[in-house]
Amino acid sequence: LNEYLRLTSGETHYMVRYPEECDQTLEAAQKRLQAMEDHERSFMLAAFLDGELVGNCGVNAMSDHFKMRHRASLGISIKKKAWGLGLGKLLMEKVLEQAKENGFTQVELGVFADNDRARHLYRKLGFTEMGCIPKAFCLKDGTYRDEVQMVKFLMD
């Protein structure tokens, strides 16, 4: 998993971390995955191409408090070599379907404002842009990027 995170984090600036920040110990990674497995509604799907991990998409409960139980955050990453295959769309469709089955009625995500490809996909899947956080990300070169907050409601 660390290797996958390092690779995807280095392929584009659209990830929230740099490759050198993906250095979880095996124990920490296992603990993180176990916590997700133990949570009754949070989950992650992985995509493999010829036995190689090329994508993952997951949903995490934002809170277990009653007033926020309906909300989940979504994260996704796809290796560049698998871009354009429809994998992101497929993973997100499956994750959104499962999120609804798990009782979530609202799924939220944040995306780099200059990531037009991702924003297009999210809008195509029914997400709506709700706001923008200026200078949410500071890159190593000293420049900043805004973050667009998006939401999809899963109610019938």
Where are the predicted features?
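Short amphipathic alpha-helix that is part of the acyltransferase structural core
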Residues: 1-24
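Acetyl-CoA-dependent GNAT
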Residues: 9, 21-81, 92-93, 153-155
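Short glycine/proline-centered loop/turn elements that form peptide/ligand docking sites
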Residues: 88, 92, 114-118, 135-140
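Conserved GNAT acetyl-CoA-binding A-motif
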Residues: 92, 99-110
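Conserved catalytic-core motifs of GNAT/GCN5-like acyltransferases
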Residues: 108-111, 123, 128-143
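Terminal substrate-recognition subdomain of acyl/acetyltransferases
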Residues: 141-156
